[in-house]
């Protein structure tokens, strides 16, 4: 059995910083609030909850005694209106919005002021997109996953930072084909970490007989890695933890490739490697 692990695994830098901030804050406090699910990973959420982190998903979840408490804004970011309200309800608000997301918001804002209508390739209900909508002029904004005809002629095209590079390129080609823009700007706003993980997944899946994509089942970037891998390696499995390996048939001849989503902790990867090492030993 051969085991190959992608070079880029574990949390991305934005998630890691937010996770560290939560853990450090809990050293001095017995509880801390997080606005929105920190990461799309059940194991991480359970770990933080047991340590004293409390997730709130909206203003209705804020307790009456919150004025003495600290709240952390996750890496996806939120709307300006939400942030202003939270600052009135909590004594301390720590904004951990990923810099890449912040840069996208600022760029869209600037270009709208320059007269551009903005088309965003992304999921309308994704937390990052909801935050973007709440910080820019929605009347000059379209969020879509499908190429559509647009009456505006001066257009900026950008992407949600966690979308697939190849899918974004296909979207651009299609939307340019069905529209006649007089002025169009195209900006690559996909996170470089996302692109590098995609490339590693592509390479590993082409030389593996079995691929393990480790990450939350509701994680957008993990689902994307799974789709890429499945194209080239039919025996691709999307798993959340090492416990699921018991359901997968592994042979001594397998060449196993392992990749992780950006919201997957290294601890979960280590459990998977531990299980596979034991399997390898049992085969020999």
Curated annotation (Swiss-Prot):
Binding sites annotated in the UniProt record for [4Fe-4S] cluster: 12, 98, 191
Principal EC category: oxidoreductase
Q: What positions does the entry give for (2E)-4-hydroxy-3-methylbut-2-enyl diphosphate binding?
A: 40, 76, 126, 161, 219-221, 263
Q: Which UniProt keywords apply?
A: 4Fe-4S, Iron, Iron-sulfur, Isoprene biosynthesis, Metal-binding, Oxidoreductase
User: Which cofactor does this sequence's record say it needs?
Assistant: [4Fe-4S] cluster
TM region positions: none
Reactions catalysed, as given in the entry: isopentenyl diphosphate + 2 oxidized [2Fe-2S]-[ferredoxin] + H2O = (2E)-4-hydroxy-3-methylbut-2-enyl diphosphate + 2 reduced [2Fe-2S]-[ferredoxin] + 2 H(+); dimethylallyl diphosphate + 2 oxidized [2Fe-2S]-[ferredoxin] + H2O = (2E)-4-hydroxy-3-methylbut-2-enyl diphosphate + 2 reduced [2Fe-2S]-[ferredoxin] + 2 H(+)
Gene Ontology molecular function, alphabetical = 4 iron, 4 sulfur cluster binding; 4-hydroxy-3-methylbut-2-enyl diphosphate reductase activity; metal ion binding
**Amino-acid positions noted as binding isopentenyl diphosphate in the UniProt annotation, renumbered to this chain:** 40, 76, 126, 219-221, 263
Q: Where is the active site?
A: 128
The pathway it acts in is: Isoprenoid biosynthesis; dimethylallyl diphosphate biosynthesis; dimethylallyl diphosphate from (2E)-4-hydroxy-3-methylbutenyl diphosphate: step 1/1; Isoprenoid biosynthesis; isopentenyl diphosphate biosynthesis via DXP pathway; isopentenyl diphosphate from 1-deoxy-D-xylulose 5-phosphate: step 6/6
Question: How many cofactors are bound and how?
Answer: Binds 1 [4Fe-4S] cluster per subunit.
Pfam families xref list: LYTB
Question: Quick one: which residues bind dimethylallyl diphosphate?
Answer: 40, 76, 126, 219-221, 263
Q: Which InterPro entries match?
A: LytB/IspH
Q: What is its EC number?
A: 1.17.7.4
Statement: the UniProt record of this protein carries the keyword tRNA processing: no
Summarize the protein's role: Catalyzes the conversion of 1-hydroxy-2-methyl-2-(E)-butenyl 4-diphosphate (HMBPP) into a mixture of isopentenyl diphosphate (IPP) and dimethylallyl diphosphate (DMAPP). Acts in the terminal step of the DOXP/MEP pathway for isoprenoid precursor biosynthesis.
Family of the protein in this entry: Belongs to the IspH family.
Could you identify this protein by its name?
Answer: 4-hydroxy-3-methylbut-2-enyl diphosphate reductase
